[in-house]
Structures are given as C-alpha cells and as structure tokens.
Amino acid sequence: MQFKRLSDLIARGELQGKRVFIRADLNVPQDSTGNITEDTRIRASVPAIQQALQAGAAVMVTSHLGRPVEGEFKPADTLAPIAQRLSELLGQPVALKQNWVDGVDVAPGQVVLLENCRVNKGEKKNDDALAQKIAALCDVYVNDAFGTAHRAEATTHGIAKYAPVACAGPLLAAELDALGKALGEPASPLVAIVAGSKVSTKLTILKTLADKVDNLIVGGGIANTFMLAAGLKIGKSLAEADLLGDAKAIIDMMAKRGASVPIPVDVVCAKEFAPTAAATVKDVADVADDDMILDIGPKTAELLARQIAQAGTIVWNGPVGVFEFDQFANGTKTLAYAIAESKGFSVAGGGDTLAAIAKYDIGDKIDYISTGGGAFLEFLEGKTLPAVAILEERAQG
C-alpha cells in the first residue's frame, strides 16, 4: 500500500507554520454522567498531535462520539470531557470549538478540538459541499482513525479528496503496515483463528481466508457448524444448519490445495449455559443429545497450539470458547499463550479478542493489536477501505 505518511512530511520540514487537520478516533466509552471510563483511544491519538505540534503546525483535531442526530447537537454529544483529557495528556490547553465548519482560529503550536463531527449535516453521507468546506480549513489533512476507515464520510474520505495534502497518521500507518504484512506478504505457514457465535456474521471472512491460509482454526458456535458439516453430533449446541453447505465448501476448498480446517477431537460440554455450569470433557464421538459444547477440549487445544507454534504468521479474531466462565476458558487460554510464545508475526483484533488478551495479560507479546473493530473485519474480508483508498489515490498524484 502506497500512501503519504505524516512522519515523511515532518522529516522534510513540511509542517512548519501549516494548518493541520487530524481526524482521530476518540469515540470512548462514558458513564451516565459523561465521565470517560476507558481512555485507550485518546492516549493512542496523542503521538500524531504531539508530532504535528513539535513540527511547528497549528493543529485541529476532530472525532465522532456516539451516534448523534445530524444538525441537532445535544449535551450528551459533546467532546468536552475528551478535550479535558487530551489537555492533561498533552500538558497544554486544548480549547473545544463549536460550529467550526466555516472557520477556526488556531496558531502554530496550539491545538484545538473541533466538536463532534457527526453533528455536522452531511458528515455521514460524505456530502461534497461539506467536505470542500472542511478541506478549506487546512493545508494538511491527517487520517489517524483506522476504526472509521471502512466508512466514507466527510471527515474520513471527502476531505481527503480536496485538502492540499492528505496523509496517514502514525496509528493508521502502523495498522495498515501490520495488516499488510500479515495478509499481503505473510510468512508461511499462515494460521488464522476465526471464532464467534455465528458463521453468518463471519462467512465472508472465512471464505476470503480459506483462499489464503494454511490452517483455518474455527471456534465457538462457528466450530459447531463445521463439526456438523464434518458429520459429528453437537447435541443442543449453538449452530446454523442452513450454512452447512458453506462450511462443507470451505473444508473442501482448503483440502484441495493441501490446507485444512482442523475439526476438534474433544470438547468441553455442559447441560446449561451458566457461570456455575458443570464442565465435562468428552471425545467428539461421545457428545450427548442434551450437551452444549462451550469450549474445545484439552487434546484439541494442544494440537492447535502446536500448529500455532510452527506458524510464520498468525491472525486472531475471536476466542474459541466461553472464556468468560473459567471452566470453559482453557481452550482460549491455551491458544492465547501459544500465540504469545510463537515466533511468528501475530495480529489480533475484535472486541472479545482484546478482552481475552487483557485477561491473560499477553498484550506485549502480540506483534500488533488492531483497534479497528469493523474496519479490521472488513480488511480481513478483503474489502477496500474507502478512507485508505482515497489516501492511496492522492499519493499517486
């Protein structure tokens, strides 16, 4: 992927005295009184802002927060708590500007936060007139919001068409570099772990990866559907009978090119889905009609851990069992530690995956943890991300 980078512009001294517009992802969770409960995204936005300030730029930053109604600003939509947190992290004042589309006063060395961009009429529809107005505010546009890269909106796509210069910030660039390395030019064998409750939500990803990977490890409800497709009994476990044909096609497609979807040899079952449910390890042939499969068994976990240990590249999206309940967490825990210890290049993403990484404290052992949510999944699906495509287009001239 070829795109301009903020770091290159800074290295060439091209930000001195310039007006820089940074689209960040500051969409953080808040409690009922508006206090920020988790500030990872705000902290992740700081390097781009600091780099631009140190390079002598006048810096404007914006983001969406929640799902406001366009043209109807409500107190709950405000970025005020974020301005305060940014100010603490940067060690300098961060003024919050409202009604900013028609002009912003900011001097070199200063940073201002522009109020919730999704309140502007036309933002979500990528309105061309709005995009041109916003682009006129700056000399350099920086997209540092991978989490919204799959959406074509006025501050993620339209502005990049019209700003004099459009580039990727450090967060976006690192994300694209890591995902490009994992899927564009992967060291083999390439192992993907795709887990979740439903095949239907991840069918496109499964089909795309089935073309690329050496081992496609499935977990959760997805694995149950694949077990059914392989002719195994799954009791009363969650599965999608209408997608058996798709699961069979993926198994056959991979087998034809010497790749595999490893089907579990043992599983952890319970009679009910509850935090106190009794867990029983069973060989797959012994699953009873009233059993629910809630994790892969220890033999399966060990076999998969060996495949992960030999991998050149690992892409991880989803825990393989109900890891929130400790008695059904062994599969996810075993694979998490195998990924952490593997010498292969590892990329992980998705909310539940991030929760598992936090639970087993392996964040520093994963090569790249994607903050992207929906954008990460669309990248895995092989889709073009509009916000990235426009940066590539601008880089070509």
UniProtKB/Swiss-Prot annotation:
Major localization listed first in the record, in broad terms: cytoplasm
Pathway: Carbohydrate degradation; glycolysis; pyruvate from D-glyceraldehyde 3-phosphate: step 2/5
Family of the protein in this entry: Belongs to the phosphoglycerate kinase family.
Gene Ontology cellular component list: cytosol
EC number: 2.7.2.3
HAMAP family for the chain: Phosphoglyc_kinase
A GO term for molecular function: ADP binding
Full protein name: Phosphoglycerate kinase
InterPro entries the UniProt entry points to: Phosphoglycerate_kinase, Phosphoglycerate_kinase_CS, Phosphoglycerate_kinase_N, Phosphoglycerate_kinase_sf
Keyword presence, tRNA processing: no
Subunit structure: Monomer.
GO terms under biological process: gluconeogenesis; glycolytic process
Segment forming the signal sequence: none
Domain of life: Bacteria
